[in-house]
UniProtKB/Swiss-Prot annotation:
PROSITE patterns: DEHYDROQUINASE_I (PS01028)
Pfam families for this protein: DHquinase_I (PF01487)
Lineage: Bacteria, Pseudomonadati, Pseudomonadota, Gammaproteobacteria, Moraxellales
Active site residues of this protein: 163, 190
HAMAP family assigned to the protein according to its UniProt record, in alphabetical order: AroD
Protein's name according to its UniProt entry: Catabolic 3-dehydroquinate dehydratase
């Protein structure tokens, strides 16, 4: 998919933040050190999802669970998804739940129109089962704005996201997209890109550092695949606040076991 190129004026309009934004979700501080880990629920069935949630709930190295709704066999059945989401939230207890529909436009399994995307998320937000919601920044802009406002009204944090499984955009473009997410009202800024070279990995990491110097928002950035693993491990050194790990099955190329990830994060964590 060819994504729109954003202007670079967003970087110029931002100044070095005086302090970082932090959020307390189910007693978890998001936005400060140490880096918080996310683990995906990649199930196709209700039973598999419940089992995976129990494993995440019991794993001390997993801080947040991501519910990959698009991977479910019944992803289009809103009522079933909401019911399952409520069960997952109960099982996870003190661990936050991030609800995500990764659409086919950005490497996911569910193909939906902008109207359908807005309708589904609006239904979820009537009585939220999640504490965080992933909203793709390049969906219809009016829908993104409406969903972001609705999520905030319901006290749900917005993880605004962008994914490029084909390439790594320029450093300038990555910076521009992340700062655009900030201007669009995101609480957490996310981008995932695919490297073709070592330089691509450093492009993502340098962009993360630049955005961290211009935005107060927590950053969730990654260079995917084995080549980009270092970006997940050293994210704190670049100003990142969150990183994806896995227990069992990965939801994206390059994810590593969450226990190993946690140890790596502790080893390279910069001194405050």
């Amino acid at each position: 998919m060819s994504l729109p190129i954003l202007s670079t004026t967003y970087a110029a309009e931002n100044t070095v933040p005086a302090s970082k934004s932090t959020y307390v979700v189910k007693n978890l501080n998001i936005g400060d050190l140490p880096v918080k880990t996310l683990v995906p629920i990649t199930a196709k069935t209700r039973e598999q999802a419940l089992a995976q949630a129990k494993v995440i709930a019991e794993n001390k190295d997993a801080d947040i669970a991501e519910f990959r709704i698009d991977l479910l066999e019944f992803a289009s059945d809103t009522k079933k998804v909401i019911a399952l989401g409520q069960e997952l939230n109960q099982i996870l207890k003190d661990k936050p739940l991030l609800a995500t529909i990764r659409t086919s436009n950005e490497g996911g399994k569910l193909k939906v129109t902008d109207q359908e995307y807005e309708k589904i998320y609006s239904e979820y937000l009537k009585k939220p089962f999640m504490q965080l919601l992933d909203i793709e920044m390049f969906r219809d802009q009016a829908a993104v704005a409406k969903l972001t406002k609705l999520a905030h009204q319901k006290k749900v944090l917005v993880v605004m996201s962008n994914h490029d499984f084909d390439k790594t955009p320029s450093e300038q473009e990555i910076v521009s997209r992340l700062l655009k997410q900030d201007q669009m009202g995101a609480d957490i800024l996310k981008i995932a890109v695919m490297p073709k070279s070592k330089q691509d990995v450093f492009t993502l990491m340098n962009a993360t550092l630049k955005v961290s110097e211009q935005s107060t928002k927590p950053l969730l950035t990654m260079s995917m695949g084995r080549l980009g693993t270092i970006s997940r491990i050293a994210t704190a050194n670049m100003g990142g606040s969150l990183s994806f790990g896995m227990i069992g099955e990965a939801s994206a190329p390059g994810q590593i076991d969450v226990t190993a990830l946690k140890q790596f994060l502790k080893t390279v964590q910069p001194t405050p």
